[in-house]
Amino acid sequence: MEIRQAKFIKGIIGTDDILKSKREQIAFIGRSNVGKSTLINNLTGNKGLVKTSGQPGKTKQINFFSAILTNTSADDTTKRNKEVYLVDLPGYGYAKIPQSQREKMRKMILWYFISGEAKIKKVVLIIDAKAGLKEFDLEMIDVLKEYGPQYGYDFVIAANKIDKLNQKQTHKNLNKIKEQLGENIPVIPISAKTGKGRNKLLEWMEK
């Protein structure tokens, strides 16, 4: 599968007409500085799609990008292309922004996943493979486990930045992450920088 023709549509901070669209949504969520923007750019093949910033916590809205998922293995050409929204949620957990702003973004993120307004199909929760799961990651996982079945969406843990770890460290850290999860939640090791693991993540998104 490939993601093609991705382009920015709009940013929202709450209820919006775009949520009434029948297009399914693939959401990307993660702490500030885990490489979320770089990963989305890598998956879409468009390095300038999501603006990366040296200032964590800069994104304060939920950004929608239209895209076409192309299943190159489909025999029926009518089933090859599917229009979706890629949804880039604000990075969370950055300590240097005011507490009030952090809490506002937290509530906006939770609203997106639990309100039932968004037609979410898949959620990619991006973490830093070296840092492992942090407090808000675990809170998000609990939310996704509770509301995913209710609203019909699946989620995966994308353990990013494995290019910064050697093979032994990668194996050790992934095992620790899986132990923390304690159940059958898929974990895909990736590198948004080098593209390693990209195809596995795309395969999961296609299911």
Please report, for each region that a protein language model flagged, where it lies by residue.
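Hydrophobic aliphatic residues
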Residues: 43-47, 113, 205
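Canonical P-loop GTPase G-domain recognition
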Residues: 3-16, 164-207
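Active-site glycine-centered loops adjacent to acidic/histidine catalytic or metal-binding residues
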Residues: 88, 160, 191
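Flexible beta-alpha connector loops of hexameric P-loop NTPases
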Residues: 92-102, 163-166
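Conserved G1/Walker A P-loop phosphate-binding module
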Residues: 1-94
